[in-house]
Amino acid sequence: PFIEVSLKVVDVEEGTGRNAGKLGALVVEGKDMDKFIKTNVGSGLTDEDRETFWKAKEKLIGQIVEVRADAITQNQETTDEWSLRFPRFLKFRGFEKGEKL
C-alpha cells in the first residue's frame, strides 16, 4: 500500500552525473497527520521534467506537489522531523502533466 501526501517545495537541488545542469531533486516539506515531513524527491521526474523545471526553478518555490511513498518514517537525525520512504513525484497540484508552470 502507498500513501500520498501534498507538500510544499522549499528548495531545489541541481542534479549530478547525467542530470548535471538539470533538476536533481525537489526539497519539500509540510504536515501530514500532525507529523512535520521534510524530504527530497527526484524519483518520478522525467528527463524532460528535469530540464523544464530547472529552467523555471524560481517558480517552483512555494508550489504544492503531490508525492507518493511507501511510508512516513522518523528522521534519524532529529526526533521532531519525519521523512518519506521511497518518495516519488506525481504532479504539481493545480497543474496537469505537460501543462506549463
Residue ranges of model-derived segments:
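Nucleic-acid 5′ end/cap handling module spanning
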Residues: 1-95
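Extended, charge-rich, solvent-exposed interface segments
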Residues: 100-101
